Curated annotation (Swiss-Prot):
Gene this chain is encoded by: Aire
Disrupted gene: phenotype observed: Deficient mice show an altered thymic organization with altered morphology and location of mTECs. They exhibit defective accumulation of thymic dendritic cells in the medullary region and generation of naturally ocurring T cells in the thymus.
Tissue: Highly expressed in a few cells in the medulla of the thymus (medullary epithelial cells) (at protein level). Expressed in thymic but no peripheral B-cells. In secondary lymphoid organs, expressed in a discrete population of bone marrow-derived toleregenic antigen presenting cells (APCs) called extrathymic AIRE expressing cells (eTAC)(at protein level). Detected at very low levels in thymus, lymph node, liver, brain, ovary, lung, testis, kidney, heart, spleen, bone marrow, skeletal muscle and adrenal gland.
Organism of derivation: Mus musculus (Mouse)
Protein name (database record): Autoimmune regulator
CDD domains xrefs: PHD1_AIRE, PHD2_AIRE
Domain spans labelled HSR: 1-106
Assembly: Homodimer and homotetramer. Interacts with CREBBP. Interacts preferentially with histone H3 that is not methylated at 'Lys-4'. Binds with lower affinity to histone H3 that is monomethylated at 'Lys-4'. Trimethylation of histone H3 at 'Lys-4' or phosphorylation at 'Thr-3' abolish the interaction. Binds with lower affinity to histone H3 that is acetylated at 'Lys-4', or that is acetylated at 'Lys-9' or trimethylated at 'Lys-9'. Binds histone H3 that is dimethylated at 'Arg-2' with very low affinity.
Highest classification ranks of the organism: Eukaryota, Metazoa, Chordata, Craniata, Vertebrata
Amino acid sequence: MAGGDGMLRRLLRLHRTEIAVAIDSAFPLLHALADHDVVPEDKFQETLRLKEKEGCPQAFHALLSWLLTRDSGAILDFWRILFKDYNLERYSRLHSILDGFPKDVDLNQSRKGRKPLAGPKAAVLPPRPPTKRKALEEPRATPPATLASKSVSSPGSHLKTKPPKKPDGNLESQHLPLGNGIQTMAASVQRAVTVASGDVPGTRGAVEGILIQQVFESGRSKKCIQVGGEFYTPNKFEDPSGNLKNKARSGSSLKPVVRAKGAQVTIPGRDEQKVGQQCGVPPLPSLPSEPQVNQKNEDECAVCHDGGELICCDGCPRAFHLACLSPPLQEIPSGLWRCSCCLQGRVQQNLSQPEVSRPPELPAETPILVGLRSASEKTRGPSRELKASSDAAVTYVNLLAPHPAAPLLEPSALCPLLSAGNEGRPGPAPSARCSVCGDGTEVLRCAHCAAAFHWRCHFPTAAARPGTNLRCKSCSADSTPTPGTPGEAVPTSGPRPAPGLAKVGDDSASHDPVLHRDDLESLLNEHSFDGILQWAIQSMSRPLAETPPFSS
């Protein structure tokens, strides 16, 4: 055994410079040495200060020189920690040292040359992982089978519990990514735990997690619960004797509350019990013996898991970098600020609440223009009409809102609105076709019904097109024109009603020709809806000579 101890000391002296050059970061090697009591607290702080002044290789070279003066047990522990998986992943140059390590040297031998520490310092040391595991099992003395078979009934819902998963005993270590890609969990400290929702008021369903031990970037080693891909750290599993030591290293206090993506669960049995549901994740129940929580925001970004200048959410413990937000912020906003998860959770919570029954409302009255009323709306029943004065620019009629399936305007009502161009004159419509010959070249628009037609097809005996106010054969027949002058049928004396303005109480509107689908689509593409409304308002301002007065 003595020969093996001397061999380890000689190997450390031989590879001291190589190890110091391979260590380019104090974490996780230095923190692991402090956690396993290989490096005391004062030497830990001294190495960190030296790293800031001279660099990491020089600081570790001085630490290894000091370690050569220690007993053989400390050197054995150093080699064990150095060749752990997370150190080999973090420091790739250590593989060459491991490959050249003598095969006959056993690093698993027991430590006999090191005396256990006694006195007050021994009380400050954190217990070994097996002791922690035993402490974890004591609060949950109920067997998993009993918890799984236990059913809790709540009003309006039936809860089901899942059987606990079997712990995987062949997993020695599990590596989890942090901001720098390093996060480790101790081996053989995983156990499936199923908690019924009835144990904690305000929770729904059963939450199943795995108790694990986690080593964080700051060097702290704590118990946490794994639920899916998330890890939550209850304050109960923190060792009280090790908090002072961990606080001195990390410079920040531990988070004592169990967090499940924004959900907070306080201690059952207190006067105030609050359960915050955010992001739609069910809250994780806390243990009955958990101490009073002290709400604080996290000291790392919830997106990239890195520190720095963070903006804290006022609705949950999360914190974010301004650049990690979506969309990113340029500066910290003033007043209260909530993250997208809190806002989404509020919307989902409002939608999940039952709506208060309201008395049935009367059908809304929709004011529409008189000139835009279709023929089908006139036969739906009596309507309340306002008495219009002679100098009114626009006349409105209050109609009961029609059925959603019924269109407000029919193609026959849109024909006169879309017939005029920018100058109020009919023009050629390339996409429309004549109703007689079916040809779409050089077609004209009727000034009354906006139907596409050829002059030669509707009036083959006419010599030329008189005027610009052209009408098709059907519209000219209604107004009794002469075949040679169909566009002059409208009298010029007296006020002329707007084309397409439906008369109140007149049933002749149902005889308006219906546009084909191609004609209607072409008209809608050529004219905007604002132009249609503007035309309607201008047309409605003209006095209606043929319209009877409205009844009061």
